[in-house]
């Protein structure tokens, strides 16, 4: 039986109610999920609590897993799998972290619009975030559709952006927040990478903007000018008409396509426990289309 999903937003995001994630998926079910992702870019699975083994097994259906920022963090993990990212305000001893702890700073960085692991090549493909413990209020996650944002740009602006590239760096979003105390080893763990501002999605064939909080500047332009252009594009892309806000329930799993979706966490009381757990798959290396007109991933 094919999976089906109902739109939660006029442009993207589907809720899937007829697929159990705790067991093995058939090849047909994996293809169905990928087809739904190509169209909707975000899928919501309600009432699907997963342990660490189940989450890893589900994620591995969709490609090689990546560790992302763990190369920079260089800290012990609470999890049995290095590929699971701890999206929480909980320290390794299991207690809620102090307000100035790096775990909490990481939560603030996650409240900036970003694409997971855009600071590496290949970058992330899918992220799968599971809700374990939630605060009494706040802590929603927002997603914006970068395909629709690109489509909505004036044609002359699209032409101006064609061929421009931005440099993405793992620590840029942390530096924005004043979190600069990193060793040379940490700073050099993931060198900056260059990405085209406009790319083409390999699954849907749609063009999209590729920006976010890891993008530090536009190559070949003065830093100030490039950053203002990035800010203008982000302001355009995150208009309410392009944004879906997810209010979490324990047991939710949300899956999104980092190639064509930005996301951010929303504010909550950081003294209240909030635990989510993320697995992320790697994408393919970005390549130039056969006609040389766009970058495809």
Curated annotation (Swiss-Prot):
Which residues does 2-oxoglutarate bind? 141, 248, 274, 278
One GO molecular-function entry: metal ion binding
Q: How is the cofactor bound?
A: Binds 1 Fe(2+) ion per subunit.
Q: Which GO annotations describe the biological process of this protein?
A: 2,4-dichlorophenoxyacetic acid catabolic process
Catalysed reactions, semicolon-separated: (2,4-dichlorophenoxy)acetate + 2-oxoglutarate + O2 = 2,4-dichlorophenol + glyoxylate + succinate + CO2
Tell me which cofactor or cofactors this protein depends on: Fe(2+)
User: What are the entry keywords?
Assistant: Aromatic hydrocarbons catabolism, Dioxygenase, Iron, Metal-binding, Oxidoreductase, Vitamin C
| Regulation of catalytic or functional activity | Activated by ascorbate.
Which InterPro entries does the protein's record reference?
Answer: TauD-like_sf, TauD/TfdA-like, TfdA_dioxygenase
What the protein does comes down to: Involved in degradation of the herbicide 2,4-dichlorophenoxyacetic acid (2,4-D). Is also able to degrade 2-methyl-4-chlorophenoxyacetic acid and 3-chlorobenzoic acid.
Q: Which family does it belong to?
A: Belongs to the TfdA dioxygenase family.
Q: What is this protein called?
A: Alpha-ketoglutarate-dependent 2,4-dichlorophenoxyacetate dioxygenase
Organism the protein comes from: Burkholderia sp. (strain RASC)
**Gene name in the database record:** tfdA
